[in-house]
Amino acid sequence: SETLAGTPDGAPTELFLNSQARRTLAAHPQRAMVLAQSAKDGGWSTLGLTTPAYERVVRAILRQAGDWRPRETDNAARLDWFVPLLGHADARLHQLAYLEIGRAPYGEVRRLAGRIPARTLETLLDEPRYLEWRNLAILMLGESAREADRARVRETLARKARFGSSLNLAAWATALVAVDGVDGIGRLESLYLTNKAREDDELKAVIQALSVHAKADATLRAPVAEAYRRLLDTHPRLAPDLVHDLIAWQRWDFVRQVEQARDALDADPLAVYSLGLYLRFAQAKQGSRTPQWRTGTEAPAASDRTELGETP
């Protein structure tokens, strides 16, 4: 046996190997089983039988141990290293690459998308065994320069809107904005945000997509904020899902709508707290008195709107 990393504690390796693994090792003595020992209880687990490619990757990862921090998501060089493994014939390496790239920030996913072969994306999108991995492929599809891929994004989003499906909707909505920019935001407004019949899970998926883009691209914050405004006009109950972004972007011009939503949601203490936090920030930033709380959804008086920087 060979120790790849760490220091053996001298305890015997007690591990059950199934019959298939034993037969494979007997037939291919050059192969080995990779084992890992738990630092917590000393127990052993199997990481799989080696193939030449799998062994090379395991050894290479261990060599990088000093440079890679646990659970880091913003190491561009590390992400670049895993890109060639996405779509690898060895499913374990393919999964490993997905787990690394799939937790990267959206900006990194966009950067890497052009390096993923079209065939790999098609496999991730179309094969049922990759259903739970589909979101990453959808986000990357949104970065494609191929018109067929861009058309697929538009058509899939339209179909989801038609059938009221929220499965992977956040990813498809994100891809649509990547494809069509501000026009895509407008499309999401008309299909979802201003549609009174939409369910909350659909609306929250679209909010997530818009938020991702506005965080990644400051030039989209203004159109996204206006989309939020129209959403609040139609679905004020979703105000708690928006105030984090509004605070981060210092958009204090939503006071009237947030105040109305706060009064309407007064039975939900968490909603009241988050909306009240926005209103307190707005009051502090605007240098005016805290708006008076009202019952129902009555709009602030003209004098209140003037104090808060809005035109009466």
What is each PLM-predicted segment?
Residues 59-88:
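N-terminal "cap/leader" segments of large eukaryotic alpha-helical scaffolds
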Residues 61-72, 95-111, 132-146, 167-180, ...:
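Structural detector for internal amphipathic alpha-helices that build alpha-solenoid repeat scaffolds
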Residues 86-90, 122-129, 155-165, 190-200, ...:
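Solenoid-like repeat scaffolds
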Residues 1-47:
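Basic, polyanion-binding surface patches
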Residues 81-91, 96-103:
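Mixed-charge (acidic/basic) macromolecular-recognition segments
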Residues 38-69:
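Short, structured interface segments
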Residues 267-312:
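Eukaryotic acidic, Ser/Thr-rich intrinsically disordered low-complexity regions
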Residues 75-84, 107-123, 147-159, 181-193, ...:
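Amphipathic alpha-helical scaffolding segments comprising HEAT/armadillo-like alpha-solenoid repeats
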